A protein has these predicted regions:
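Short glycine-rich substrate-engagement loop in P-loop NTPases that contacts/grips substrate
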Residues: 59-69, 108-150, 166
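Loop/turn-to-beta-strand initiation segments
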Residues: 84, 112-113, 150-153, 182-188
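Walker A/P-loop nucleotide-binding motif
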Residues: 82-99
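P-loop NTPase Walker A phosphate-binding motif
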Residues: 98-112
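Interdomain "pre-motor" coupling segment immediately N-terminal to P-loop NTPase/helicase cores
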Residues: 2-44
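Pre-Walker A (pre-P-loop) alpha-helix and adjacent loop at the N terminus of AAA/AAA+ ATPase modules
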Residues: 13, 43-44, 50-86
């Protein structure tokens, strides 16, 4: 071995992350580890999977929720750059976060780059990147923002719970629009109705949610409350 030769952590892809245009196993492992960390940080349980989704809890709304469940599972299993953008809408405790986490796991396991974050945390990163006086904090936020803008699938949970400021609205538009322009896919969940979204955000954001996202309405009663009663 020539001491002048480069030494790579992954000799297969030479640390590029890709082999002949396809994601290398080393990068796949990194993305899987990162999305698992994100899910573990944000969710009470870190083992959400489609097999654990209990449709029996939905009562009269079961038939409608079966369609939602099947759509989410198919979306995750067949995810590609031709997949649609999804907007989950419905009240609290109906499984939006659970199913979005299920999608994140399957898509990541299939070798795609995935980011999963709450709207509050995601939009805060844009503000930190721009205004933080601490260089390291600003750099970390910049890395997070770049990852959210560029990953193949961005899952933005709980839109509408973030503190509404001009900066947050601007960041949300940048996130959604940049990903649309670059052909990156996004799944957004919210408790807000169409009317509430229009009242809270500007026309630019709402027109993109209306025109570029497929809406999945969630039905039923708060599952968390039902589980406490069982």
């Amino acid at each position: 071995m020539d001491y002048l030769d480069d030494i790579y952590s992954c000799p297969k892809c030479r640390d590029t992350g890709y082999i002949n245009g396809k994601m290398c196993s080393c990068l796949k492992a990194l993305y899987n580890a990162e999305v698992t960390r994100e899910l573990g940080t944000l969710l009470k349980n870190s083992d959400e999977c489609f097999e654990k989704f209990d449709l029996s809890l939905y009562g009269s709304a079961r038939e409608s929720m079966e369609i939602v469940f099947d759509t989410c599972r198919e979306y995750a299993q067949s995810f590609s750059d031709r997949s649609m953008n999804l907007l989950f809408q419905g009240g609290t405790g109906l499984g939006k976060t659970f199913l979005s986490a299920c999608i994140a796991r399957v898509v990541a396991e299939n070798g795609h780059s995935v980011c999963y974050d709450t709207a509050s945390s995601a939009l805060e990163a844009f503000e930190t990147k721009k205004f933080s006086r601490d260089i390291q904090t600003a750099e970390n936020a910049a890395v997070k923002v770049e990852r959210m803008l560029d990953c193949e699938l961005m899952i933005l949970d709980d839109l509408g719970t973030e503190m509404l400021t001009p900066m947050a609205v601007s960041a949300l538009y940048t996130l959604i629009n940049t990903r649309l322009v670059n052909g990156r896919k996004t799944v957004i969940s919210t408790n807000l109705t169409d009317a509430e979204l229009l009242k809270r955000y500007n026309a630019q954001i709402c027109s993109r949610l209306e025109g570029e996202f497929t809406k999945l309405p969630f039905f039923g009663s708060d599952i968390r409350l039902l589980k406490k009663e069982i």
